[in-house]
Amino acid sequence: MSQIKALEGAEIALVAMGESQLDFHLAKSHSKKWTEVWGINAMAGITDCDRVFMMDPASRFLDSDAAGSQTGIMVDVVKSHPGPIYTCQLDERCPGLVEYPLLDVVKATKCSYFNNTIPFAIAFALYNKVAKLNLFGIDFTYKGNLHFAEAGRSCVEFWLAKCIENGMVVSVAPRSGLLDTDVPIQEKLYGYHRLEDPTLILIDEDEEFFNMGFKEYSRLMEEKQKADGEVVMTVNTPPEAKRY
């Protein structure tokens, strides 16, 4: 499969089933738009997705209940979604399935480290030269299998590092623990977090890094709040009308 020209320079929302998917729905309610929305597995049954990544064979959902409570919604997805649904094997019962371009992606990225579905989607974005990738619902908070959660998160963060090194802008839902996004800003840098005035690393409007003390940062945020007359939000809240 050749690279998709329409994706070069695109901004993508990649949405999975974790709790921080809420940030995706809230962003939509605030009129946020993306070039395309890509869904992981059952998310395609919840919101409109331009592309779906389902790296299990469709038989896992059609011929067994191994996926638990997601089985029913996945049966609906694989039978009704027009595609493309990228997967590892075609199935005549599912017209929207497309074989994932595994060899093309591996050759282009020089890596074959894929231990769950999400890295396949991230690598696909890298392969197609996506400019900005926004991640929602990718939290790896599985309580029943901590090893799977830790291994999956590390693989995802590895691929995000490759994307960042290649110039892609990566954004993570504020409720997600991915890349320590939900860690308080004054606790993100180990060691420095123990100082009386913890050091922060920030990014300016020109996407250049700079450092600042937490006390100065807090003062500036307080001044901005007073000047703007509103709370500076880091997490979207339900939208409200200007006039009632």
Over which residues does each language-model region extend?
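Metal-ion/cofactor- or nucleotide/acyl-coenzyme-handling active-site neighborhoods
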Residues: M1-Y244
